[in-house]
Amino acid sequence: MGDQVQFARMNGLGNKILVVDMRGRKDRVTPQAAIALNADPATEFDQIMAIHDPKSAGTDAWIDIVNSDGSMAQACGNGTRCVVQALAAETGRKAFLFHTVAGLLEAKEHDNGTISVDMGKPRFGWDQIPLAEEFHDTRRIELQIGPIDAPVLHSPSVASMGNPHAIFWVENDVWSYELDRFGPLLENHPIFPERANISIARIRSRQEMDLRTWERGAGLTLACGSAACAAAVNGARTGRTERMVTVNVPGGPLKIEWRERDDHVIMTGPAEWEWSGTVDPVTGIFARNEPESGDNGARAL
């Protein structure tokens, strides 16, 4: 085996996360390593959260986010909660400030074990999302799947939560749509020059919605935190919901608040530790640690 680092297999409401400790190193998890890890059923994942030494004063870490296809992501709310749980177990602290390519992320662990992440302000400008064409109102853009006179999905609300999202509002059960079929087509639609996360959302009340997501670079997942935030924000700005909602993703509920005083989006939910090991961040070759007697719950990396 080559040069190994510590990593943990975790999940945020079923969103499969590998938290990799790259502190003290100058290199990064390679796309080849990500693809190799995703090809093994033991380490198949949705996102890698690679923890690096901080690049700016006052922050606790720089985090690289890698999708299962080896591409880089700008945001992963569920993965951020997993990082918080691992670092809280390591340090005994409750609050953290991370830096990512999308900006700063504040996060804290609550006494009940849930974790809140400040995902920052949503962006609605067509060139901020970004879109390939100018739209003055991104609450509803011209995009559809299916026949012109009877589209299956149409007129999504779009926004950026550090990464681009399109939310299609539907009347039927979110499970009745072939998202595994439509997702790749919409993710790679020319209107999205950086590709996009594609979600279908059904409103249950002004305080609750159901959501399924095809994640850019990862495919169908049980949970996508940034998509839940994008859906909640778009629900509020289109008049469908209040600014505080429960978003039911396949893995369970997330609490999302679009805070009025500063427009920041706060996501709250759980994280779960599964197992740990060592991995070569260049090749993806890994070894699983033997569990200790009575080993359960969150542990330090």
From Swiss-Prot:
Gene3D superfamilies: Diaminopimelate Epimerase, Chain A, domain 1
Record PROSITE patterns: DAP_EPIMERASE (PS01326)
EC number(s) from the headed UniProt entry: 5.1.1.7
Protein keywords: Amino-acid biosynthesis, Cytoplasm, Isomerase, Lysine biosynthesis
Amino-acid biosynthesis as UniProt keyword: yes
Compartment list: Cytoplasm
Recorded superkingdom: Bacteria
Reaction catalysed by this enzyme: (2S,6S)-2,6-diaminopimelate = meso-2,6-diaminopimelate
Active site: residue positions: 76, 224
Principal place of residence: cytoplasm
A GO term for molecular function: diaminopimelate epimerase activity
Keyword Ribonucleoprotein set for record: no
Family, per entry: Belongs to the diaminopimelate epimerase family.
SUBUNIT field: Homodimer.
Name of this chain's protein: Diaminopimelate epimerase
